[in-house]
Amino acid sequence: MDFLTQRATEQSYELLAHLEHVLLYDYRRTRQIAEDEKDRFGCRSVAKDLMRTIETFRDKVNADQQFVRYKTLVGFESVFPPHWEDEEFDFGEVEKFRHERAGEYIDAISEAAEDEWYRVVERCASTKSDDMATFPVFGEFLCRLAKTKPGVATRFLGRADDNVLNFLPAFLNGLKESGSDEEYRAVLTRYLAGGKHLVAIARHFRKTGTVSSDSIKEVLKRAVAASDDIAVIEVWFSRSKDMNRKSTLVEDVFVPAIKYLIGRKDARWVHGAWFLGKTFFPVLSADHANLVLDSLVSLPRIEYHAERILVYIAGPHPKAVWGFFGRRLAEKREEKEESYEAFPYQFHGLEQPLAMNVKLAIGSVRSLFRAGDTLLRFDGGRLLSTVFPAFPEPFAQKLSDMAANGSDEDVGFVLGILQNYKGEAATHPVLKALVNRLSEDDPRLAQVDISLQNTGVVGGEFGFVEAFREKKAVMASWLDDPMPRVKGFAAEYIRRLDQRIASEQRSAEQMKEQRKRDFESDDMIDRLRG
């Protein structure tokens, strides 16, 4: 502690705030020992000494008024006087304390003290952090300063470096509320003309609700000209809540913004669009929804935020979403990057609107299939199995009709889909229709065999044995089917299944015996497993 105290004045405010936070909890733990009158651990005096050294460090660092101001305005580990006496001094009380002090700081800023307080602002703004919990109090402080003392805020901006200008939205928000329209317009015009702080201006527009459409269009125009993707996204978001089919903002802002982002193949906007939800995406026209989908094609994978957007669009425009996945499947086949995923292995809500129209779902994927397409099982077929994981009856009926009455291409299409399932009972009507359709020597019957034998993950030494026995039991009903081809296929399949069961049984027993010999006893095997 003496080492830290001696060198405290040489350390950054960021480090001092963190050290004080850590030492606060050491102090609280030590106090329990120091106040133990029975001295159960025999170190009460040592604990008291440690408390005194921590207090010495605390008092020294807090003697620096600039540090106290800094930790009040910046950070989330800041420690204040009530923390040392009251362990119940919670987050809500801390925030109240900080906001009250920030108000006092604003009151203390006079023309004579501007230089001193600008240095405080400059030091706070120089803090490097990507944690959103670092600057809320500081941002509110700047907003309140600009609102109550617009002249001071304007002069601060006149000398601001890049770090301070990172907080330009807070200044603009305050100036907008200050009632000093002339100063507000002058600042806004200056930074808009400079074209270097378009993101900040757009974020300010998101905060205020009284910005003219001409101002928004001007920022968008400059952002596009400067190839500032983030600024374009922020301009779109700034008035997204006011965009509906009757609003000119859709054509004037959303359409040029999304078309620009499509051209840039930049879909980062999805990570900030979650808050738009039902107020924006479901009310888009078909043409506008397709623009959103065009932009999403460039995403390397469909994650949570993108799926939420697709759910909103799939309700009114399911055909467009199926077409979107068709484009992603084509992109996957052409894309050299292995990281590109056309669709996730499991949906978390999108399957519901997509499964509402079975005919549309199957027809959309069928339109992508051509004879001899060996990849169907791994893309389009898997997409359908992801949307219909339980193989519902309407889905089964449509596939059965295709298997029985469709073309040879339809048969290949159905086979590619079924290989994504595990021979569940729900798939059997379709498989029977295929068996009845195909001749006994048709090589495609091997794909029916594969569909029936798929098991997924099994467990235990005799996992495959048990899985195949269950499949054999389910297949017994096929032997009573009125269709001769189905009966004959079932008898032959069960015969091969018996051979497979016997083979798996022998293999499992041999491996078990070999382990016994290698590890001497079952007890040793159990110990190794446990």
For each of these PLM feature ranges, what is it?
Residues M1-G530:
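Non-catalytic all-alpha helical scaffold/repeat segments
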